[in-house]
Regions:
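N-terminal active-site beta-alpha-beta segment that forms phosphate/nucleotide-binding
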Residues: 1-117
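Surface-exposed, charge/polar-rich loops and edge strands
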Residues: 2, 13-16, 67, 111, ...
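Short linear sequence motifs
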Residues: 42, 134-135
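Flexible, active-site-proximal loop/turn residues at the rims of small-molecule/cofactor binding pockets
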Residues: 52, 127, 188
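Short, well-ordered alpha-helical microsegments
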Residues: 55-58, 142, 167
Length: 192
């Protein structure tokens, strides 16, 4: 078992063990940090995620973004699982969501945008380190979709995490995406 596989397993088990109360408190605190940091959201198109498996909830942040008149988009995974490049569909309401093969809610009948059109990308993660690297679920969708755009720095990559998801190193590889910041219940980590 590789270090990444072992770390992923450990952090997922830890995340799975948190209570509903802990998860709700994490959402409240994370959302407060987000709203205090992004008081005037300069981004028109924001990618958000639908949380699964006890990922940090995004409902409050999504509502805030929409109240500011901005558009939220959800990742859309291609039915051909060999195609790792995600597209993004506009999120209008919960009723429009359909679960994909990974049990992730997607908005299927909404306008699509490609990754380069997004200005703020809010991502789930399994772990993150001091340098801003993230460890995801292991499929590489975010890495593959955004790696080429990261070089132009027109997009901001933001992770949402629990404090226990911070680790010394995610042992990044060349293809791994680096985030600009991570928001946790206790505060914000910014990376240069």
């Amino acid at each position: 078992m590789t270090y990444k596989t072992s770390l992923r397993k450990e952090k997922i088990q830890e995340r799975d063990s948190i209570s509903t109360k802990e998860r709700d408190l994490a959402e409240k605190n994370t959302a407060e940090h987000f709203m205090n940091t992004y008081t005037e959201l300069d981004f028109e198109k924001v990618s958000i995620y639908s949380p699964i498996k006890n990922e940090v909830p995004t409902e409050t942040i999504t509502r805030y973004i929409k109240e500011l008149g901005k558009k939220c988009f959800l990742p859309l995974i291609d039915k051909n699982l060999n195609n790792k490049e995600m597209k993004f569909s506009e999120f209008t309401n919960e009723a429009s969501l359909v679960k994909n093969k990974f049990n992730i809610p997607e908005s299927l009948n909404s306008p699509l945008v490609i990754a380069s059109e997004l200005e703020l990308v809010i991502m789930p993660l399994v772990a993150f380190d001091n340098k801003g690297y993230r460890l995801g679920m292991g499929q590489g969708y975010y890495d593959f979709t955004f790696k080429n755009f990261q070089l132009n720095k027109k997009q901001v990559f933001l992770g949402l995490a629990y404090d226990f998801q911070k680790t010394e190193s995610c042992y990044p590889e060349e293809h791994d995406l680096k985030m600009d910041a991570v928001i946790c219940p206790s505060g914000i980590y910014k990376f240069s």
